[in-house]
């Protein structure tokens, strides 16, 4: 049985992950649930707070993270919070020999480098991904092929999320951009939206458009526009369960790895071949 701690436990993703783990009691046990410092619900069982009944894991706060880790000894910590607190969580978990599944997005390059150094130094295993949905990763894999075969077409990326999402563009859109640029046989330049008299579109442009509204879980479309035809590759998530299922697979994948390496969902889903 894999013992799991979740930070961001009362968030949309955190609570969904806990519910799914608890539905698979033979394989997983939620031993810790962490949320923001001074949370008024501290001490109340996380199961009671998310509507599934007592599971024996009282809500704790981030300022007590190391104490709770030492008491519960999780195998894997799952983090869906925000960049700055996540980096601190990675440090504490790594120093206490706890493997990681990170779904937080919006990191700076410096924050990513810091986490990589911490994970390598402490010789733990980690999965870090902008999107854990299985379909999205097939979407990413298909983008590799399209960029290689029709990369001379004009390329645009459009993403839409719910009105509460704090970062833009989404981590998934940025990952799509990275995959495209890594597989193009030409120069490219990312731009973010267009406004005013911008002139004709240049061949190098890959423009990302971020839309926000309503309760959209996550829509991503990459457009390859050529002369006389247009190919659009789209993934739409209708439920967070799409992401949660991938997170659970990542927990199982990383649980016993102690090698100082960072893996991604291509590794988890065996898509790297």
Swiss-Prot record:
UniProt entry keywords in alphabetical sequence: Amino-acid biosynthesis, Cytoplasm, Diaminopimelate biosynthesis, Lysine biosynthesis, NAD, NADP, Oxidoreductase
Residues bound to (S)-2,3,4,5-tetrahydrodipicolinate: 162, 171-172
Catalytic residues, chain numbering: 161 (proton donor/acceptor), 165 (proton donor)
Statement: the UniProt record of this protein carries the keyword NADP: yes
CDD domains tied to this protein: DHDPR_N
Pathway: Amino-acid biosynthesis; L-lysine biosynthesis via DAP pathway; (S)-tetrahydrodipicolinate from L-aspartate: step 4/4
Catalytic activity: (S)-2,3,4,5-tetrahydrodipicolinate + NAD(+) + H2O = (2S,4S)-4-hydroxy-2,3,4,5-tetrahydrodipicolinate + NADH + H(+); (S)-2,3,4,5-tetrahydrodipicolinate + NADP(+) + H2O = (2S,4S)-4-hydroxy-2,3,4,5-tetrahydrodipicolinate + NADPH + H(+)
GO biological process, one term: lysine biosynthetic process via diaminopimelate
Documented EC number(s): 1.17.1.8
Subcellular location: Cytoplasm
InterPro entries per UniProt: DapB_C, DapB_N, DapB_N_CS, DHDPR_bac, NAD(P)-bd_dom_sf
Highest taxon above the source species: Archaea
GO MF annotations, alphabetized: 4-hydroxy-tetrahydrodipicolinate reductase; NAD binding; NADP binding; oxidoreductase activity, acting on CH or CH2 groups, NAD or NADP as acceptor
Keyword Isomerase: no
PANTHER family cross-referenced by the UniProt entry: 4-HYDROXY-TETRAHYDRODIPICOLINATE REDUCTASE 1, CHLOROPLASTIC-RELATED (PTHR20836:SF0), DIHYDRODIPICOLINATE REDUCTASE (PTHR20836)
Cited function: Catalyzes the conversion of 4-hydroxy-tetrahydrodipicolinate (HTPA) to tetrahydrodipicolinate.
Family membership: Belongs to the DapB family.
Cross-referenced HAMAP family: DapB
Protein name: 4-hydroxy-tetrahydrodipicolinate reductase
Native organism taxonomy: Archaea, Methanobacteriati, Methanobacteriota, Methanomada group, Methanococci
